[in-house]
Amino acid sequence: MAKLVGSIIDKVTGESVETKVQVLTAGGKFIHPNNAILKIGPGSPFFYSNGNFEIDVPRGKTRLTIERGTEYIPQNINVDVPAHGVVDLDINIERWSVLADQGWHPGNTHIHYDENEHRPDERLQLDPRIEDLRMTAVSILKRWDLEYAS
């Protein structure tokens, strides 16, 4: 196996950027760092990145998708990974709009946690930053007691 080392950088500021990352092997299998916080639930799998990640990757064509909120252009990258060694990736993501400059402030008033999550508090702290939200409200549902809180 080779090691894929990624650094995600804002193209304009040069600063490290927190993002969602999906890594698919040549066989289409989703892989992630061992200690990563993962998306739970339906939809495409991804892990949360603080701007840097390391993953052991099998040889072959590997596809990465990098996303950050609605103001950044998603990046799709294909990498031909060798059988051994280290593949360093500096991934620049570009902001296409600054909504706050136009009087808009992105938010989400209905963020859920999943009762199957192992680290919900960490994920709920990351989610608003990675989605580049200015305001959020977390909804908690005790499924069997039917109590609901925001």
Show which residues each predicted segment covers:
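A short, amphipathic beta-strand motif
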Residues: 2-11, 21-23, 62, 91
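A short, solvent-exposed beta-strand micro-motif common in secreted/extracellular proteins
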Residues: 21, 45, 59-69, 128
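Short, surface-exposed beta-strand/beta-hairpin micro-motifs centered on an aromatic residue
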Residues: 43-46, 50-57
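Extracellular beta-sheet/turn segments enriched in Thr/Pro/Gly and aliphatic residues
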Residues: 79-99
